[in-house]
Each structure stands twice: as structure tokens, then as C-alpha cells.
Amino acid sequence: MIPKGYYYMFNTVFIILEIVGTIAFAISGAMTAINRRLDALGVIILGVVTACGGGLLRDIMLGVFPQSLFIDSLYVIISASTSLLLFIVFYIIKDDSLTEKKWYNDLLTITDAIGLGAFVVVGADVTISKMAEGLNGNVFLIVFMATITAVGGGMLRDIFAAKVPNIFCNKSISTWYFLSAFKFFFAFS
């Protein structure tokens, strides 16, 4: 169990993780939209859906109403701003061949990995907090919700972009994040 004196330190760490994950997933969503040649609104929507969609799905499944996304708009603002900034950069560059370069796909993979890593921890923490408030559940609920939080936005991004979700195509990634949720639970229980 975490000593009570460390609560604020861990709270700060989780806020930083949420912000880092939000920026990473917003970049991932915006890059997918740019690759699909969407306009500015499409880029912003795909960026916000990717960054905030997993938490929205988690909150709906946990029965949280209104969902966190609608209470604290900071993460929507961060993801929309990040997506718009990326759109502007690519609009200024005006080089359609950039999305076909290796570094572009590598950056997409890296931002996905950062977002997944951050949100699997955040998803587990939020679920544990809800269980402390009286939600019935066990380790499987925590692991499932952590996984949904981590992969939900990316799944929605890929569905909106008319692609098979990456999480279903790369089995090793989904397995590692599922196991990471177990690890987080046992580390703090």
C-alpha cells in the first residue's frame, strides 16, 4: 500500500502521465488524419478522439456520469491544440510525400507507445479509485479498464479512419499492455 504522505507526489505523477499521454495520442490521431488527407476539423476531431476516447469509454463502462472528459476540459484543449498545431505545421510544409517517409511511421509508432504506456497506468489508477469509492470489482476489472483506457482511443481513431484497429494487428503490443495493467495492480495492492 502507498503511504499517505506520498499521495500528492503520486497525484502529480498521474497528472503528468495524463498530459504526456494526451499529447502523444493527439499527435498519433492528428498524424493518422493528416495521412488520410483530412481537413483541419477532421485532424482536430481525430486527435481529440484518440487522446480522450479511451478514458471516455472507460468512464461509460464504469457508469461514471458525467464522464471526466466533460468535467475537466483541459485534456480536450491540450489534444485539440496539439492536433491543430500539427495540422498547421504540415499545411505550411505542404509536402504530401512526408506521410510516406519511414520517420513518419516511426513517430506514429513511438507516440502510440508513449500514449499506451501512460494511459494503462492512468486507467488502472482511475479504476482503483472508483473501487475505493464503492464500485464492486476485482483485479480483472482493473486490468480490463486499464486496457480499455490505453487502447480505446486508438481503436476509435482507426475505426474513424476506416482502418482495422492496430491493436488487433500487432498482438505483442496488446499483450504487453494487458500484462502491464496486472503489474501495476500488484505493485500497489
Predicted regions located by residue number:
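Generic alpha-helical transmembrane segments
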Residues: 145-151
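Forkhead-associated
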Residues: 54, 152-153
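Membrane-helix boundary/interface segments in integral membrane proteins
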Residues: 153-163
